[in-house]
Amino acid sequence: MTYSKDLSIVISLYNEDESLPELVSWIEKVMTAEGYRYEIIMVDDGSRDKSWEIIKELSERNPYIRGISFRRNYGKSAALYHGFKAAEGRVVITMDADLQDSPDEIPELY
């Protein structure tokens, strides 16, 4: 099987509009430094804040970012499931959007 990307980073989120720009910037910095072919799949699990609008803005600026939006909150398992289904990377890594997981650790996971 041939993969178009080295890594798929699946991020499930709910009401994380404030952390998304910083998280994406941090991931991009690490991916560029490591030279990975990657994608970021953000699954908005029915957020009531501006998370989906921010995901759309980020994906317009970076073709490596894709978003999936749920109409209501289905839970983290459902969000991850749909993120995994959409993933095109050889390796899939999950992260939370609240900056509790450091993108600096991604190379160790890969």
Where are these regions (language model features)?
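Structured catalytic core of nucleotide-sugar glycosyltransferases
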Residues: 1-110
